[in-house]
Amino acid sequence: MLIYNDIISGDELISDSYDLVEVDGVAYEADCRKITIGGETFDTGANASAEGGDEEADDQKETKIDVVHAFQLQETNFDKKAYLGHLKSYMKKIKESMAASGASEDEVKEFEKGAQTFAKRVVGSFKDYEFLIGPSMDPDAMVVLLNYREDGVTPYVTLWKHGLKSTKV
């Protein structure tokens, strides 16, 4: 299995157990599922009816998105101006990382072009996105984008391809 870590924070953001689809050569999208957390009942073997009904667990059921839950992603908020400021800074760090890892100038330019196109698409539908960060809550790290498919039911996450480093486990 491959785990994908943020190149800035080192946070685990996703794994190849989710079907990653490359978009425009600069991003990955992965469909998610809504899961229910909590609400478990535990049978301790005691006769609860003999002692009253006070022994039930007070667990609340919560619906979460599997990727968000599995990788402990934290919701954060951005207005459009703040997100663009973060994105500009983050793209600069990705380009530096690409250059440091031996990427050619052509590869970096190709990334820049694709990233600009993709970023325009994100900004065009900015209000539809939710923003997530890794558990370290590093303000310089990748912001994972969460949106819903056209059916309005299927959530999916978007991650910057060049901002991830894969580790085999």
Swiss-Prot record:
It comes from Davidiella tassiana (Mycosphaerella tassiana). PANTHER family: TRANSLATIONALLY CONTROLLED TUMOR PROTEIN-RELATED, TRANSLATIONALLY-CONTROLLED TUMOR PROTEIN. Its main location: cytoplasm. It holds the Pfam family TCTP. This is Translationally-controlled tumor protein homolog. The keyword DNA damage does not apply. It comes from the Eukaryota. Belongs to the TCTP family. GO terms for molecular function: calcium ion binding. Keywords: Allergen, Cytoplasm, Cytoskeleton, Microtubule, Protein biosynthesis. One of its GO terms (cellular component) is microtubule. It is found in: Cytoplasm, Cytoskeleton. Coiled coil: none annotated. Residues 1-169 form the TCTP domain. One of its GO terms (biological process) is cytoplasmic translation. Involved in protein synthesis. Involved in microtubule stabilization.
